[in-house]
């Protein structure tokens, strides 16, 4: 199991990222729009820099829903390889069968 503080920190980052998503997208659109004056674009850059860093989507780490493990995760299942193997072996994931040829 991962430290609960790390899992809670990541969940807080997810909430902040979803909250700030529209605001960040609007400011980024202003910054990238070449037709606007440089002053407006620079002001949007400063406002973007004032937003909290944890509100950025790339700060969110994909973690296992069961164990909180940060590595070897399958996005489709939101599980790490260890938890996926345990659940698949016990038949708790519908449609997932062990390969044999």
Swiss-Prot record:
This entry's Gene Ontology molecular function terms read: rRNA binding; structural constituent of ribosome
Q: Where does this protein have compositionally biased stretches of type Basic and acidic residues? A: 11-20
Concerning InterPro entries, the annotation shows: Ribosomal_uS14, Ribosomal_uS14_bac/plastid, Ribosomal_uS14_CS
Q: Which domain of life is it from?
A: Bacteria
The UniProt keyword set, sorted, is:
Ribonucleoprotein, Ribosomal protein, RNA-binding, rRNA-binding
Family matches, as Gene3D superfamilies = 1.10.287.1480
Q: Which GO terms describe its cellular component?
A: cytoplasm; small ribosomal subunit
Q: Which PROSITE patterns match?
A: RIBOSOMAL_S14 (PS00527)
Region span, Disordered: 1-20
NCBIfam families hit by this protein: PRK08881.1 (NF006477)
User: What's this protein's function?
Assistant: Binds 16S rRNA, required for the assembly of 30S particles and may also be responsible for determining the conformation of the 16S rRNA at the A site.
Name of the protein in its database record: Small ribosomal subunit protein uS14
| Annotated source species | Granulibacter bethesdensis (strain ATCC BAA-1260 / CGDNIH1)
Q: Which gene encodes it?
A: rpsN
């Amino acid at each position: 199991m991962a430290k609960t503080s790390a899992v809670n920190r990541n969940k807080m980052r997810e909430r902040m990222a979803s909250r700030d998503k529209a605001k960040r997208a609007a400011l980024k659109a202003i910054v990238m729009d070449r037709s606007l004056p440089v002053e407006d674009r620079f002001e949007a850059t400063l406002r973007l820099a004032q937003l909290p860093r944890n509100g950025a989507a790339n700060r969110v780490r994909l973690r296992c829903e069961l164990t909180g493990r940060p590595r070897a995760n399958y996005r489709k299942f939101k599980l790490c390889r260890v938890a996926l193997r345990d659940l698949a072996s016990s038949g708790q994931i519908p449609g997932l069968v062990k390969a044999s040829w």
